[in-house]
Amino acid sequence: MEYCTKEQLIAFEQKVAYHWEEGDLPYLIHLSGGNEDFLIDLFKDMRDGDWIFSTHRNHHHALLAGIPEHELLARILRGDSMFVFDSNRNFFTSSILASTCCIAAGVAYSLKESGSDNWVYCFLGDGAEEQGHFYEAVMFVEGQDLPCMFIIEDNNRSVDTTLIERNPTKFRFEMPSCVIRNDYKATYPHAGNGTKKHIIFKNKK
């Protein structure tokens, strides 16, 4: 499964950032930047029929899952940036931290019981890593040997709070094999790392 190049991913987020800075988007958006290479390699291993559970920061995931650029941009412009889904592609998101982890584990259990060889890929950020739902789901998946992978996209931010501010000891559990982590440095236009412009939102009818 591979539908976008690195250049296309970056250009798309720059386009969304432009609309944001022009005041066209009086809604919350969460842009990505700096994690393109990792995601492209990861999505190359995904197959049709696999399930993807994304987060509020989902634009890269949606494009790599095959949602067309024009369709995704239209959804973002109408305020659905955090709620993108496509049931035909088994692609779902949620704006609530770690809320999809247990759902992903349940889908993986169903796939195993039905004899399917498809997998579930569940994304979360380093802020969601601190939520109990995540650990419950990981223990269930690992204990039942389910076809589910949890991908922690660690941009060292929970809203605007760094790991050292949230966890001064930097203590982290050793994760089982069903969890992989991508530590990356956020680059523009990643939300929280942009131009810090004062934006006047345009009236929406």
Regions found by a protein language model. Give the residues of each.
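Conserved N-terminal diphosphate/IPP-binding helix and adjacent helical/loop segment
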Residues: T5-H19
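Active-site-facing substrate-recognition patch
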Residues: M1
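Thiamine diphosphate
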Residues: Q144-K205
